Amino acid sequence: MSTWANLGLQDSASPLMEQLIFFHDHALLILVMITVLVGYLMFMLFFNNYVNRFLLHGQLIEMIWTILPAIILLFIALPSLRLLYLLDEINEPSVTLKSIGHQWYWSYEYSDFNNIEFDSYMIPTNELAIDGFRLLDVDNRVILPMNSQIRILVTAADVIHSWTVPALGVKVDGTPGRLNQTNFFINRPGLFYGQCSEICGANHSFMPIVIESVPVNNFIKWISSNNS
């Protein structure tokens, strides 16, 4: 989760988020190099006294500054396209979770199991435990197994919502009358926080998401206890 004065991305908890961070660093490096080069050229042009009175055209330099940006754009576009296709792949999920956005809470259904569904509301500040996180903790967490492929189906009951967990690199719009899906793989245990990322009304900022990643054995015990 984001911490106080944190300006960077959250620590990744899935292979997809790791790839997103790598792409961010790759694109940022290229942008910094371009900025430094342009700044250096502008500085040198402003503070030198050299003048070429016979310069009419420069076909070579025009070719260079046309072809070079095209090559740079390819270096950014190709990794981006690869990542877009990776984000859309569904790889034989072990668990399917359905999330339904409401004004202003989430409801969840474990589609592979009978009778496991619940609503998840934000805990009000006056009811929060001393170690709770304001505007982020919920009364019912989503329990998911680590090291397992998870598919999530997202829809909405009223207006457009967006189910987002930054540490997992997941952001899926919930649209009324439509099922959107994506997949993710949690590679470590822990609590991962997210929020609705589509303005959906007065209490838009009060519908957080909390995922608790647990070992598979613990997940099976939790499923068994809820089924019984």
Swiss-Prot record:
Cofactor: Cu cation
Enzyme class: translocase
Annotated compartments: Mitochondrion inner membrane
One GO biological process term: ATP synthesis coupled electron transport
Sites where the protein binds Mg(2+): E198
Protein family: Belongs to the cytochrome c oxidase subunit 2 family.
Catalytic activity field: 4 Fe(II)-[cytochrome c] + O2 + 8 H(+)(in) = 4 Fe(III)-[cytochrome c] + 2 H2O + 4 H(+)(out)
Pfam family, one: COX2_TM
Protein name, per record: Cytochrome c oxidase subunit 2
Enzyme Commission designation: 7.1.1.9
Residues in compartment: Mitochondrial matrix: 49-62
Segments traversing the membrane: 27-48, 63-82
Membrane topology category: Multi-pass membrane protein
Cofactor binding mode and count: Binds a dinuclear copper A center per subunit.
Mitochondrial intermembrane domain ranges by topology: 1-26, 83-228
InterPro entries the UniProt entry points to: CcO_II, CcO_II-like_C, CcO_II_C, Copper_CuA, Cupredoxin, Cyt_c_oxidase_su2, Cyt_c_oxidase_su2_TM_dom, Cyt_c_oxidase_su2_TM_sf
GO cellular component: mitochondrial inner membrane; respiratory chain complex IV
GO molecular function: copper ion binding; cytochrome-c oxidase activity
Residues given in the record as Cu cation A2 binding sites: C196, E198, C200, H204
Keyword tags: Copper, Electron transport, Magnesium, Membrane, Metal-binding, Mitochondrion, Mitochondrion inner membrane, Respiratory chain, Translocase, Transmembrane, Transmembrane helix, Transport
